[in-house]
């Protein structure tokens, strides 16, 4: 179950949230504002008060807005195709933006999820694998990308 909270104060892009359960430093949350979800990161926790930095304009944000904490940290997505794109600091694809800025609450995929790559297996079916083990690789241009087991996974490779 995701932790919930409510905005209790706003100073520019620094927002204070009262939470109903513990959250972690650097955890990602989304603040609901008229059907748009503003991404923010926890920068300080003091008891049930959490200070978050909002990465977008807070114009229109009010005390009482609902906040949902995702239970994970700010992450980047790595994979083939990453070298052929331009990103901002949150890994939004700058080439797909309509204008100079993204619209509030709009997020782009950092990778082309429809692109197909030639996969060369490095693990064999039946191998026991754990986080960070190499499963295989794909080549982007001249650079091989290693495909690894995600950090929270372990098991038999099929």
Model region roles, listed by residue range:
Residues 1-158:
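Peripheral, non-AAA+ core regions of ATP-driven protein-machinery
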């Amino acid at each position: 179950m995701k932790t919930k909270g409510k905005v209790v104060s706003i100073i520019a892009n620094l927002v204070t949230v009262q939470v109903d359960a513990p959250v972690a430093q650097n955890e990602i949350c989304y603040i609901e504002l008229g059907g748009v979800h503003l991404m923010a990161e926890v920068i300080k926790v003091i008891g049930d008060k959490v200070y978050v930095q909002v990465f977008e304009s807070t114009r229109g944000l009010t005390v009482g807005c609902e906040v949902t904490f995702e239970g994970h940290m700010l992450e980047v997505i790595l994979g083939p195709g990453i070298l052929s794109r331009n990103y901002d600091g949150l890994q939004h694809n700058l080439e797909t933006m309509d204008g100079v800025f993204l619209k509030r609450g709009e997020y782009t995929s950092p990778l082309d999820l429809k692109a197909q790559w030639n996969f060369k297996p490095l693990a064999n079916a039946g191998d026991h694998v754990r986080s960070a083990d190499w499963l295989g690789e794909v080549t982007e241009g001249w650079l091989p990308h290693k495909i690894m087991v995600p950090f929270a996974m372990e098991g038999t490779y099929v």
